[in-house]
Amino acid sequence: MRYSILKTSLLACTMIATSAAAWAGQAPGAAASADIPISHHDRIYAAEQFSNTVSVTDPVDNKLLGVIRLGDPQPGNFSPLYKGQVLVHGMGFSPDHKTLAVVSIGSNSVSFIDTATNAIKHVTYVGRSPHEAFFTPDGREVWVTVRGENYISVIDSEKFAEKTRIQVPAGPGMQIFSPDGKYGYICSSFNPETVVVSVADHAIVARVKQESPFCPNIAASPDGEQVWFTLKDVGKTQVFNAKPPFNPIKTIETGPITNHVNFARAPKGTFAYVTIGGTNEVKVFRTDDFSLVTTIPVGKLPHGIWPSGDGTRIYVGLENADALAAIDTATNKVVANIPIGQAPQAIAYVPNAAPNPDDRQNLQGLGVAGQVAHLALGPKAEAKSEQPPTSVSLFDQGLIQVLQASVTGLQPKARYVLALADKVDGSGTVQPLAAFMTNPAGSAIVNAVGPIRQIVQNSVGAERRYLVIAPGEPAKFGEAVQVQTP
């Protein structure tokens, strides 16, 4: 009897200790928590925007286990009777690692997924064009940035129902919380202002000026001292004090299409990893003096980024490569590439997500989600520059594709067209596909839909066309400044 009581007490203490340290000593948790070594119980999840899937990867083997299919690709999701999700994009997870919250921008939803079974527990619908979701550190609430409106939808994590709204500047981009759970930090994608909110009463307690209106991502350091957020349009990353008075600390020039930021805590210090979509790199910065440690080539259009539970790995979603890149933080070298679904956006590394590491229920194969073609555009021979080339991915959706171009090397705040030309040099008949305007860094993300792969890869010369970029508008544009490379 005495042995039984002692055993029960030890088990209870172990469970309490495990619960308290659930976040691990890595982001989004507190540095004081214990690290969680990489194991087969861990999972890497990626929200894949054009295949409408969530991929599930084992970090030990760096192997895709399968995908959770939340919706169908085009044109199936065009139907007025379609009930699945569209533009699977944002992602967060609960402190006990048992639930994923996955945001679908096009269907205005948050899908709650059981990490043990990969089953959808509930779908909650919110306002127009939500972007990201994350659980408060106590696990009681899920905050959703409703980017198409001007509020945070606060969802009860047990009832999966909206309990209140927090009004913020229009276009909230992302939210993250201080490791102690006291503050929520919410940047904006439409207004140059980040707000700090008291989690206890949902009141705004501070406002931080953004150097541009377009912040897609924000992260809090595990030591609770700093908040970093990215500015995608101007290619910068800002740092401010995570505690009152929430003063600005540093602005860093990071590069065109600066996407996401996250942290890895190591014996040598805490480092910030920033994905630079326009140059296909991850930049690593110290958090004490903000110096650049190294630049890591990773692949096409790096987007989401997340550390393992022990900080020995950083995983990066490659939006235009349909892959995850694994970085060894000791060497800052890419050690693995894992094929996943189409156009990964947010990713999350969840330690101890799978009680049974061999369970594959509710997972499917990639199917069409694994089919993509890659092209590149560069300056014409007479106008060569040192700017990085434009990467283009054609994501199969059956007989058509979604084209996504990560465009760089153009004039800032200028109008251009992506077009199909008769000749490889951009001459002859030119048919516009998409009009766009570059951001202040001379870059843009451009999309189009159609049977484009069949045209640009056609082996019959008379029927083949070539992708080009020309200045101007569809009704009137100039000579091509970027052309499809061999």
Regions found by a protein language model. Name each.
Residues R2-W23:
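Gram-negative bacterial Sec-dependent N-terminal signal peptides
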Residues Y466-F477:
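Short, exposed beta-strand-loop hairpins at the edges of beta-sheets
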Residues K476-P486:
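Short beta-strand elements
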Residues S19-P388, G398, S406, P412, ...:
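Predominantly soluble domains enriched in secretory-pathway, periplasmic, or organellar proteins
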Residues S393-Q397:
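Short, solvent-exposed beta-strand/turn "edge" segments of beta-rich domains on protein surfaces
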Residues A414-L420:
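Short beta-strand segments enriched for Tyr within beta-sheet-rich domains
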Residues Q454-R464:
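Short glycine/proline/serine/threonine-rich loop/turn segments at secondary-structure transition edges
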